[in-house]
């Protein structure tokens, strides 16, 4: 990496610095949000630190069971995702939703990252990924 040069005009009018980092907290992946200890800690963070949003990956992940194959049919269940969102709303917080990893039943491959094995391959059929049946 090369050098960087920063300049500051001290005679310029002061400009407020928005503290965007004070509103949102990151929390790894969504299945953790189903745990009581995680919920207690987040509730405390909200109450004591004022966080209003929480960001995590995997709200639609395999571990939450949002999409499974049953007898050659894709079956959606948002029960766990709903439980997470309902909890956040109940304590005055909101999810910062990240749509990231591919569900295994739609994936074109098996390449994954991180310890929870988020699938990083594109869908086999983009129409099915969007929830539309293929012809």
Language-model features: locations:
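Non-catalytic accessory regions flanking glycosidase/transglycosidase catalytic cores in CAZymes
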Residues: 1-135
